[in-house]
Amino acid sequence: MDGLGRLEYRGYDSAGVALVGPGGLNVVKAAGKLDELRAALSARPPAPATCGIGHTRWATHGGPTTANAHPHRAGNLAVVHNGIIENFRPLRAEVEAAGCELLSDTDTEVVAQILDLDFTARLKAAGEALSQEAVAAVLVESMRAVTARLEGAFALLAITPLAPGVIVAARRSSPLVIGLGEGENFLGSDVAAFVAFTKRAAEVGDDQVLLLTDEDVTVWDADGAVVQPATWEVSWDASAAVKGGYETFMDKEIHEQPTAVGDTLLGRVDEAGDLILDEMHIDASVLRSVDKIIVVACGTAAYAGHVAKYAIEHWCRIPV
């Protein structure tokens, strides 16, 4: 919860955690702020856990509801995901054809179901009781196979009570960082999530898959070869976490503008170069009929509006 709290500055509309321990897999989610999740955890205290995953979600596919919040559970797996899966519609049709019941409108639940189908099939093909280490290895293979089918940007984490104490993850384009501690290890979209516990971090590259335990981290490339991730020491402390290591919020916002533009466009530009804005629920014909734009803002947002005015009028030929 502390780690999720340090990522609040990014904005979100729901949150949740999944925990694995002797009692099995426990998922708790809530729409709204982290206080809502804390209340849900207080009302239903989870059993002691050996590992867990958590997520603060900003709605893309599906509205800001508890059902759409992460983690999503599918069979013996719980999954969190940061990013946008561009081909989730055909994957959703595949999942539904397989008889899976979907409880949300999200692309993440579709991925969780696809991953569980592959994971279950591989376990069944093994035909015998597997050790926890063998189960973890199967989940790594499933993660590699499934992420190879995904189009878009993602950082995916999965846990299972069949291999408690293990997190399997993969990334493409979306950020994912390893925190290397003493008798504990971490994963986060930003070092701010774990800098209070360790300042030693490692980089996860594109299309890499990893297996993390409290004592070890193993990373593979897309071809299944073990790689050694680059490591570094974080030079700032937890008090600076919300500022991303910058001296001021202004510095942070200035330097993050290119990343912010890229994140905004993730999954929203198709192969033809057209923008996809499904969550706005506005027909393209309506957008084409817009003949004037009014920017309402104050403070630094007003300055951004003044800059946007020149860009919009230049490229869209619409008065602002």
Question: Where are these predicted regions, by residue range?
Answer:
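Conserved short alpha-helical segments that host acidic/polar catalytic motifs at enzyme active sites
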Residues: 1-243, 247-248, 256-294
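Glycine-rich phosphate-binding loops that contact phosphosugars or nucleotide phosphates
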Residues: 288-320
